[in-house]
């Protein structure tokens, strides 16, 4: 049993010693079986939320009505959820009623995919009622029960299924893929924020190419913001190795570039995904820097971060691997610029006012920009004395 489970065992044992059933469930069990890095450890129990709260000193109520309590144990947090069944779903995304039950199998039956519907006992035995291990061995994404039923319960499960394809390198079972194509319009009921989270994870997976192609084949892409008329662009975009990028800003900049979205249309496209303003601004800045010649002024205006991001995207459009030497050369060229911002100039607006003996006006910022360009391009050294002499010689203003 992995360390993360051993660390969580006291929580399981406290529940069991109090006369309750308790198991590790979900993604942690899947990743353990696959020998992958394990993320959050979740626990399922037949103890009611009130009973869970009484058994542990430190708890947080994050959704008691749905059976979920966070247990704080040592320096970790564990989501402890009561076995439950869910009745009719509202808006294809949330159950109208939750009923607490005593059967682990019935609880696991409501989960989305077989690979996520396994449990583990306190002694490390995996309980697999729906063939999750077999599907992992065969690298197949399959729903628990009829896919149409699962997707009508929560339409986001369609996008989640394709996201797991990308992350795990699996394929969809034929019936799961057919059901996505049939039920795709249900995704319109899901909030943009939830779709954005899944889509970003999909892009970052090692098998994003196959996943994006599945979005195209099932036409699920039509239910994603700004994609409806982008089928051909999406086909070519699927070839891009998004997994080699390291930030959200790079991810969305690469998407803009590969989809052929022009800069004037970029804000509308990115806002449709309800991205934070900072991400939108930086992604557009990277896309704007992309494709420009690497002269001194371009590098200066771009800044180190956007410059390297644009260079990475440019390289990855030609090759799946980054050329670290070229990136270091670009970084070196940037580091050797005489100044990195207007603040680095050895002369200020106040100095210009004194030198010119003129009242303040637009001319001050214009003259600073003129000096800035001369310094960046190497025509002028960044020393106050030289700048003042140069200004007198040039007779600017």
UniProtKB/Swiss-Prot annotation:
What GO terms describe the biological role, i.e. biological process, of this protein? Answer: RNA repair; tRNA 3'-terminal CCA addition; tRNA processing
Cofactor(s) required for function per UniProt: Mg(2+)
Reactions listed under catalytic activity:
a tRNA precursor + 2 CTP + ATP = a tRNA with a 3' CCA end + 3 diphosphate; a tRNA with a 3' CCA end + 2 CTP + ATP = a tRNA with a 3' CCACCA end + 3 diphosphate
- The residues that hold Mg(2+) are 40, 42
Task: Give binding positions for ATP.
Answer: 27, 30, 111, 154, 157, 160, 163
Picking any one GO molecular function of the record gives: magnesium ion binding
| Keywords from the UniProt entry | ATP-binding, Magnesium, Metal-binding, Nucleotide-binding, Nucleotidyltransferase, RNA repair, RNA-binding, Transferase, tRNA processing
Looking up Gene3D superfamilies in the UniProt record yields: 1.10.110.30, 1.10.246.80, 1.20.58.560, Beta Polymerase, domain 2
Q: Where does CTP bind?
A: 27, 30, 111, 154, 157, 160, 163
What EC number(s) is this enzyme filed under?
2.7.7.72
One Pfam family name is: tRNA_NucTran2_2
Further information in the entry reads: A single active site specifically recognizes both ATP and CTP and is responsible for their addition.
What is the documented function of this protein? Catalyzes the addition and repair of the essential 3'-terminal CCA sequence in tRNAs without using a nucleic acid template. Adds these three nucleotides in the order of C, C, and A to the tRNA nucleotide-73, using CTP and ATP as substrates and producing inorganic pyrophosphate. Has no poly(A) polymerase activity.
Q: Output the HAMAP family linked to this UniProt entry.
A: CCA_bact_type3
Q: How does it assemble?
A: Homodimer.
Name the family the entry cites: Belongs to the tRNA nucleotidyltransferase/poly(A) polymerase family. Bacterial CCA-adding enzyme type 3 subfamily.
Report the NCBIfam families cross-referenced here: PRK13299.1
Q: What is this protein called?
A: CCA-adding enzyme
**Organism the protein comes from:** Bacillus subtilis (strain 168)
Q: What is the lineage of its organism?
A: Bacteria, Bacillati, Bacillota, Bacilli, Bacillales
């Amino acid at each position: 049993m992995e360390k993360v489970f051993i660390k969580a065992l006291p929580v399981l044992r406290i529940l069991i010693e109090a006369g309750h059933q308790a198991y590790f469930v979900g993604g942690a069990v899947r990743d353990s079986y696959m020998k992958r890095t394990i993320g959050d450890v979740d626990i399922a129990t037949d103890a009611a939320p009130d009973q869970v709260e009484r058994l542990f000193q430190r708890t947080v109520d994050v959704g008691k009505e749905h059976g979920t309590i966070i247990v704080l144990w040592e320096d970790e947090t564990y989501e402890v959820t009561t076995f439950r069944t869910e009745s009719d779903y509202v808006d294809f995304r949330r159950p109208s009623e939750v009923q607490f039950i005593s059967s682990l199998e019935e609880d696991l039956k409501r989960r989305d995919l077989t690979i996520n519907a396994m449990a583990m006992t306190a002694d490390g035995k995996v309980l697999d009622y729906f063939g999750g291990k077999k599907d992992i061995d065969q690298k197949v994404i399959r729903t628990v029960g009829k896919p149409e039923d699962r997707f009508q319960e929560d339409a986001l499960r369609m996008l989640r299924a394709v996201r797991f394809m990308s992350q795990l390198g699996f394929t969809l079972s034929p019936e799961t893929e057919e059901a996505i194509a049939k039920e795709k319009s249900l995704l319109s009921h899901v909030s943009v924020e939830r779709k954005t989270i899944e889509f970003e994870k999909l892009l970052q997976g090692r098998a994003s190419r196959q996943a994006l192609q599945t979005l195209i084949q099932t036409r699920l892409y039509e239910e994603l913001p700004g994609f409806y008329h982008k089928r051909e662009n999406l086909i070519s975009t699927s070839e891009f190795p998004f997994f080699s990028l390291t930030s959200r800003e790079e991810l969305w900049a690469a998407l803009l570039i590969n989809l052929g979205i022009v800069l004037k249309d970029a804000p509308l496209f990115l806002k449709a995904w309800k991205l934070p303003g900072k991400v939108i601004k930086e992604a557009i800045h990277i896309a704007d820097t992309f494709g420009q010649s690497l002269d001194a002024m371009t590098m200066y205006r771009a800044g180190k971060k956007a410059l390297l991001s644009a260079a990475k995207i440019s390289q990855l459009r030609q090759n799946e691997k980054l050329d670290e030497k070229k990136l270091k050369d670009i970084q070196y060229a940037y580091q050797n610029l005489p100044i990195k911002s207007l603040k680095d100039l050895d002369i200020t607006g106040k100095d210009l006012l004194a030198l010119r003996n003129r009242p303040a006006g637009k001319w001050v910022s214009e003259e600073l920009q003129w000096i800035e360009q001369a310094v960046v391009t190497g025509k002028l050294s960044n020393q106050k004395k030289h700048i003042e002499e140069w200004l007198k010689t040039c007779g600017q203003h």
